[in-house]
Each structure stands twice: as structure tokens, then as C-alpha cells.
């Protein structure tokens, strides 16, 4: 009886919506302007990072993250996850360059939690952990990254550089 009551409430609520209420588009449709804004912030962040202007890079990556997280809920979660992990990993690198090691670790850890088996995320996490002198955890992060990308020698070099 309770289930029917709840169902009736939902049906009555839906009936109150105007007939022209828009349906969300399919999840493979992305808002072009938003995608362009995200790409622009990433490009500006990357350009600033290459110039070693890390504070500006952080600002642009942060703006990009804000745009990504403002995407409508009906857009594809896999696209959002891909965009977000790259932007978090990039901001982690910029934070690390500014010696904001805890913030760098937070971003790298979030990227790894979102994407899982992703070498770049594990590499950034390992670098941040090493900067915090948490060497065993750094070694574990580098080893996980190396499992994701067995041909990438950077992981072995990073492990060898640990005390």
C-alpha cells in the first residue's frame, strides 16, 4: 500500500509539470560551450605550467574543475570522470611545484579514486607522497602506476630515487 501511495505522489507531481517541460538529452550530448570553456582553461593552465607560472596554472586548473563539476547530471559520467582526473592530475603537478605537497596529494588521490588504474594519477600521488617523506607509500603508488604502465621507465626511476 505504501508503494502505491508513493507512486501516486510521483505521478501527480509529474502531471503538474508543464507539457513543454524539456526532457534531458541523451548522455552522449555535451554542452559545446562548456566543453570549450573546459578545454580553454586546461590549455591556459598548461601554458602557464610550461612557463613555470604555477600559481596561474593552479588558477586555470581550478576554474576548469569548477566548469567540469557544473556539467548537468545527465551528461556522461565517464566523460566527466576523464576530464576531472586529467585536470586534478595537472593541478597536482602545479601544486607540487609550489611545494603545496598536501594539496598535491589530495588532488592526486582524488584522481586515482575517480579513475582507478591510471598510471599518471599514481605517479602524481607517488611524487606528492615522496615530497612529504612518506617513502613507503610513495613506493607503493609508483609500483601501482608501473603495473598500469609497465613500459613507462619513469616509475622505475622514481622508485630508484627514493631513499
Predicted segments with their positions:
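Alpha-helical tetratricopeptide repeat
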Residues: 1-163
